[in-house]
């Protein structure tokens, strides 16, 4: 409704009345992000060398990978238009090692879910600098990420970010182990 009233001094007052409902619903877009991070031995190598024992060290590959993941995580978490959740899978492998508990390192345990779904960026950024050791079992990392997809939100867009420095060196046998 709009009204105009003339005042005694020759000026006018204009009144505008607006009616509507108050909406308190959030319109944040849901996003689920899974990072799949290589923690094989070569991730400890300098960025431009194929050996950990090079003369020149311009930063480790794992440091660059961690910084990239942490930067992306913090940027996404700070976006007020997103309702974002994160998960982190790490993978490597070394067929000759025995792990705690007496388990032999086999393809089936070459990956771990380091962080299950969380909306806390700091949980991810505190876990992206794992030790680097063993071979590169892409398959184990991808299978673990696939398992996390079962826990994703149905209404969320999903991104799987795969971070590695090289070709796979281990894989599952034909029987799945």
For the regions a protein language model found, what residue spans apply to each?
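Low-complexity, acidic Ser/Thr/Pro/Gly-rich terminal tails and inter-domain linkers that flank the onset
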Residues: 1-8
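Glycine-rich phosphate-binding loop signature in dinucleotide/nucleotide-binding domains
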Residues: 149-156
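Generic helix-packing signal
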Residues: 69-72, 145, 149
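Short, charged loop segments at secondary-structure junctions
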Residues: 43, 82, 92-144, 150, ...
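Internal, charge-rich low-complexity segments
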Residues: 46-50, 167-177
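Short beta-strand elements of extracellular/lumenal beta-sandwich folds
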Residues: 10-22
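Von Willebrand factor
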Residues: 24-113, 157-164
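A general secondary-structure signal for short beta-strands and their flanking turns/coil
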Residues: 9-13, 28-30, 135, 155
């Amino acid at each position: 409704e709009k009204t105009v009233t003339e005042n005694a001094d020759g000026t006018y007052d204009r009144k505008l009345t607006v009616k509507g409902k108050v909406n308190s619903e959030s319109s944040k877009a849901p996003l689920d992000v899974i990072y799949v991070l290589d923690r094989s031995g070569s991730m400890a190598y300098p960025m431009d060398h194929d050996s950990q024992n090079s003369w020149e060290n311009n930063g480790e590959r794992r440091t660059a990978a961690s910084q990239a993941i942490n930067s992306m995580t913090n940027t996404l978490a700070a976006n007020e238009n997103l309702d974002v959740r994160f998960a982190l899978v790490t993978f490597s492998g070394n067929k000759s090692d025995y792990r705690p508990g007496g388990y032999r390192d086999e393809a089936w345990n070459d990956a771990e879910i380091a962080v299950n779904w969380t909306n806390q960026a700091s949980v991810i950024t505190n876990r992206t600098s794992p030790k680097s050791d063993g071979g590169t079992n892409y398959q184990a990392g991808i299978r673990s990420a696939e398992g996390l997809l079962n826990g994703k939100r149905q209404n969320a867009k999903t991104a799987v970010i795969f971070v590695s420095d090289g070709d796979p060196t281990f894989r599952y046998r034909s029987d799945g182990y």
